[in-house]
């Protein structure tokens, strides 16, 4: 029996794949637990169309992420913060602060969770941060922390 997997199933396949399984396995385990549905002709066409639409959305999101990264590479991100005489900040510059500054500069949404590592900058100067945008687009941005006057 051909089934369409509705969830990832260990040792069988990933969500959205069509697999050939025994009738008993499908009727007694996969279908009752909503892990799969019987793959009929119309249902398969519907799923394939949905998958094409989803793939287009993912591709558009990947392109958008690459555009944002290119804009960031050409943009000087400068944040002012209160600092002591030796260059230590009073407090820290966080991912949220940098995200807000990027949104202000680019007029684009930039989520603080897109930073690869935890951001907690406590010194003046230029810092290189790794970012991971949606669809696996990775890159680095430079942020310059300057003292407030």
Swiss-Prot record:
Pfam families: Ribosomal_L9_C, Ribosomal_L9_N. GO terms for cellular component: ribonucleoprotein complex; ribosome. It comes from Petrotoga mobilis (strain DSM 10674 / SJ95). Coiled coil: none annotated. InterPro entries: Ribosomal_bL9 (IPR000244), Ribosomal_bL9/RNase_H1_N (IPR009027), Ribosomal_bL9_bac/chp (IPR020594), Ribosomal_bL9_C (IPR020069), Ribosomal_bL9_C_sf (IPR036791), Ribosomal_bL9_N (IPR020070), Ribosomal_bL9_N_sf (IPR036935). The keyword rRNA-binding applies. Belongs to the bacterial ribosomal protein bL9 family. HAMAP family: Ribosomal_bL9. GO terms for biological process: translation. This is Large ribosomal subunit protein bL9. GO terms for molecular function: rRNA binding; structural constituent of ribosome. It comes from the Bacteria. Binds to the 23S rRNA. Keywords: Ribonucleoprotein, Ribosomal protein, RNA-binding, rRNA-binding. NCBIfam families: L9.
């Amino acid at each position: 029996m051909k089934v369409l997997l509705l969830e990832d199933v260990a040792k069988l396949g990933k969500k959205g794949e069509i697999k050939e399984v025994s009738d008993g396995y499908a009727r007694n385990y996969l279908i009752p637990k909503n892990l799969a549905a019987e793959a009929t002709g119309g249902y398969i066409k519907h799923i394939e169309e949905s998958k094409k639409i989803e793939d287009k959305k993912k591709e558009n999101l990947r392109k958008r992420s690459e555009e944002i990264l290119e804009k960031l590479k050409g943009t000087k991100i400068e944040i002012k913060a209160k600092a002591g005489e030796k260059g230590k900040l009073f407090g820290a510059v966080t991912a949220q602060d940098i995200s807000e500054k990027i949104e202000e500069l680019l007029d684009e949404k930039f989520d603080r969770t897109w930073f690869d590592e935890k951001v907690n900058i406590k010194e003046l100067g230029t810092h290189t941060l790794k970012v991971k945008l949606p669809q696996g687009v990775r890159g680095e941005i430079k942020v310059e922390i300057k003292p407030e006057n």
